[in-house]
Regions:
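Residues at alpha-helix caps and immediate loop-helix transition turns in enzyme cores, especially N-
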Residues: 32-33, 61, 80-84, 231, ...
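Hydrophobic positions in alpha-helices of CheY-like receiver
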Residues: 40, 84-92, 267, 271, ...
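A structural motif corresponding to the C-terminal lobe/cap of the Radical SAM core domain
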Residues: 261, 272-454
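Radical SAM enzyme core and accessory elements
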Residues: 1-21, 41-42, 46-49, 61-70, ...
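Acidic, low-complexity intrinsically disordered segments
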Residues: 2-236, 240, 244
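Radical SAM [4Fe-4S] cluster-binding motif and immediate context
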Residues: 184-344
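Cofactor-binding loop segments of dinucleotide-utilizing enzymes, especially the Rossmann-like FAD-
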Residues: 23, 52, 102, 255, ...
Length: 557
């Protein structure tokens, strides 16, 4: 019997009916719902999952549940989850409600009013399981009769809960098989786009946390330089069920896949030995790309197509403020090293910070052109502004002294303005431009040229008007508009898009203006590609990519 069929036949009749909610996981089928769902089900509880990025808000599921837990692994998900919690509370003011994931503690710290009963950051599964176990035997009616309980008060005996509502758990544990059968199938999520086809893609993690303390990153706020490894057999078991579901590519979503390089190599080797045709991508710091230079040829041979790496800036002073641990020159070195191994670099950027100048914007655009990265940068990367959430290591570094405005609770960040007001306007313009680029299916080259033109017009640069030519030793062998990438163009550290923030009604998820789904649009794109030879990656528009990850059905405050 196939693995997922066996899981589906296990009905998990349990003691507490728990609804797990995801709002956004970068277009992937949400691991941070599937994994705790498996743990809770194995403990005997009844579990349902709801992914608001591809499904409508399900009122009946909330009414069915004895308790609800929302996953908040990143900024975008946190903002949307808080809105979902408001809607859940409006349906049932007394339902036990939990937030879990990297942003959970931040969400509680940012709230002006108590919204949840428990927030668990870090290695959340054991604590989440204990919380649900404590609810065992308490029916929804019993909980409601406890009357006018404020969030944070005990469900068990009516007295105030002395434990903190926000906790960080960093204990080591073992992970079981995620209950992916409780979620929509992979064809509802982001895919791998190549020059010829769109392939189903899965998402796994081989480690949590990170050994570094980049000051703008939310990971060290929780993990404080620690890494927790996921057992290789657990990773492979999850990959196996993803392959059985149709995945032909896997994203390793670890904050830094090379925080434990020996573990990473063992995972990759074991996966390749078992699934020889499977391709994958990873995320790695620039300094790790260079330190582990001997790994890349082995990764390439095992199927690594591209590496996401946080370049952030070309200004070494800004990189110092962020404690990135690399220089602009090392970014170029990383590009050379990866390409020599046959792997595409896909840099992420943080173009707009309180320290950014107009020259920095052009330096970044010049780097992209000179390193032949135009086809490797999603347009939204040119528009991202620094977020400064509560607890950010930047707040205690002194780098932001005198630069911050008031705290914005709606956006979960301290505010700031550029010394050059033109930069704030440009960031906003580039955000709108990025959405338009996707909506109209611009090629990577078209998007880059539009971004550069907008920067010239906004900042007044006259010469040179044209970007520098790429250096032969830095160039890719793959045409710019045919490079492998995932069809989700957004990013974890960015504000929600206009499309996401505008998705406030209870419309069916994934509905497009013409009434078609992503799967329908993809099928039509494939047909057109076969007919006229246009690369399939160019046939999937923002309306397709954004709509299949926009959290429809959740009102945003």
């Amino acid at each position: 019997m196939r693995l997922h069929e066996a899981l589906r036949r296990d009905r998990y009749r349990g003691h507490v009916r728990i609804l797990l909610v995801s709002t956004y996981e970068l277009g992937h089928q949400p691991l941070h719902v599937a994994s705790p769902a498996g743990a809770l089900a194995r403990a005997g509880h009844q579990v349902r999952c709801l992914d608001l990025s591809v499904e409508p808000f399900d009122v009946e599921a909330v009414r069915w549940a004895d308790a609800v837990a929302c996953s908040v692994p990143m900024h975008t998900a946190c903002r949307l989850a808080l809105a979902a919690c408001t809607q859940i509370r409006s349906l049932d003011p007394h339902i036990p409600l939990c937030l879990y994931g990297l942003y959970a503690r931040l969400a509680v710290a940012a709230a002006t009013e108590p919204t949840v009963d428990l927030a668990v950051a870090g290695e959340y599964e054991p604590r989440l399981l204990r919380w649900v176990d404590e609810l065992e035997g308490r029916s929804p009616g019993t909980l409601a009769r406890e009357g006018n309980r404020r969030p944070g008060e005990s469900h068990l005996s009516g007295e105030s809960d002395d434990r903190p509502r926000a906790v960080v758990e960093l204990g080591r544990g073992r992970f079981g098989l995620p209950a992916r059968h409780l979620l929509p199938p992979l064809d509802r999520y982001a895919r791998l786009a190549t020059s010829e086809e769109l392939l189903l893609a899965g998402y796994v993690e081989a480690s949590h946390g990170c050994a570094h303390r980049c000051r703008h990153c939310p990971v060290p706020v929780v993990y404080d330089g620690r890494t927790r490894l996921v057992e290789i057999d657990a990773v492979l078991a999850d990959v196996a069920q993803l392959v059985e579901m149709g995945a032909r590519h896997v994203t390793f979503g670890d904050p830094d896949f090379l925080s434990g390089p020996h573990h990473a190599l063992r995972v990759v080797s074991a996966m390749h030995d078992t699934f020889g045709d499977l391709t994958f991508d990873v995320t790695a710091k620039v300094e790790h790309v260079l330190e582990q230079r001997d790994l890349w040829s082995r990764f390439a041979a095992a199927g690594c197509l591209f590496v996401v790496s946080a370049f952030e800036s070309t200004n070494d002073a800004i990189l110092g403020h962020l404690a990135k641990g690399h220089t602009a020159a090392q970014e170029v070195e990383a590009v050379t090293l990866l390409r020599s191994a046959g792997i595409e670099p896909r840099p992420s950027f943080l173009p707009f910070t309180p320290w950014t100048t107009a020259q920095d914007v052009f330096d970044l655009l010049d780097l992209v052109a000179a390193c032949d990265l135009v086809g490797d940068v999603d347009p939204v990367q040119y528009s991202i502004r620094l977020l400064v959430p509560p607890g950010s290591l930047l707040l205690s570094s002194g780098a932001l002294d005198g630069l911050l405005g008031p705290y914005d609770a709606d956006h979960l960040s301290w505010t700031w303005r550029s010394a050059d007001p033109r930069l704030d306007l440009l960031a906003q313009k580039l955000g709108h431009l990025a959405e338009r680029a996707d909506a109209e299916s611009w090629s990577a080259t078209q998007a880059y040229e539009a971004v550069r033109t907008a920067a010239v017009h906004a900042l007044g640069r006259i010469t040179p008007k044209r970007p520098p030519k790429s250096k032969p030793w830095l160039s890719s062998s793959i045409p710019q508009d045919e490079r492998p990438h995932l069809t989700e163009a957004w990013f974890c550290c960015a504000e929600p898009t206009e499309a996401q923030l505008g998705a406030t009604s209870l419309l069916p998820a994934r509905a497009r203006a013409d009434g078609t789904s992503l799967a329908d649009a993809t099928a039509r794109a494939a047909d057109r590609s076969l007919a006229d030879g246009t690369p399939l990656a160019d046939r999937v528009s923002l309306a397709d990519r954004v709509s299949h990850t926009s959290p429809l059905g959740v009102p945003i405050p």
